[in-house]
């Protein structure tokens, strides 16, 4: 499935491709950098999301183009994706000038063998930290666990009722709850506390 990607003015600058076969080795293919497209600064859905973000003061960040299109189909216009997993400072700074708060909606991925967290959680750990360090107010809407089955915004949020059922949590509190283990050794607990304190330093007083 070929999906056009537009810049903030609505001009097509590249295409992203989504495999329709669930057994495909590569799920997504993105366009290469060129004179009119730079992956590190491009944002999928930005042409629609910016106007809505100015009105709501909030932007929802998901992982893939189908996630954006699913939420747009439900009337949620202020949603974007980086199409690469990692958000760059250049991409996030686009929302700084509008004073937007950011809310991440990670995929629910089953952790790989030996891993404590799934890829979707790691996506938010990394990008939520960057956004917090840049001075954004950050929150998370987490898709509930479905056992061994992967769920993303496209497959789970199929109605406004599903959307409204997702509770929104402060990123730092969510991050702390994910990492802190009351039964862990003292030194491990102290590492988590120090990590959370590093995040709290970036919180701006209102």
Model-derived features with residue positions:
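Phosphate-handling DNA/RNA-contact segment within nucleic-acid enzymes
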Residues: 1-102, 115-123
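Hydrophobic alpha-helical scaffolding
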Residues: 36-39, 61, 81, 85, ...
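Short coil/turn helix-boundary motifs
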Residues: 53-56, 109, 160, 203-204
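A compositional/structural signature marking long, glycine- and acidic/polar-rich segments
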Residues: 84-103, 110, 130-132, 176-185, ...
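Conserved phosphate-handling catalytic cores of large alpha/beta enzymes
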Residues: 96, 102-162
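C-terminal or mid-to-C-terminal helical accessory/interaction module adjacent to the motor/catalytic core
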Residues: 140-206
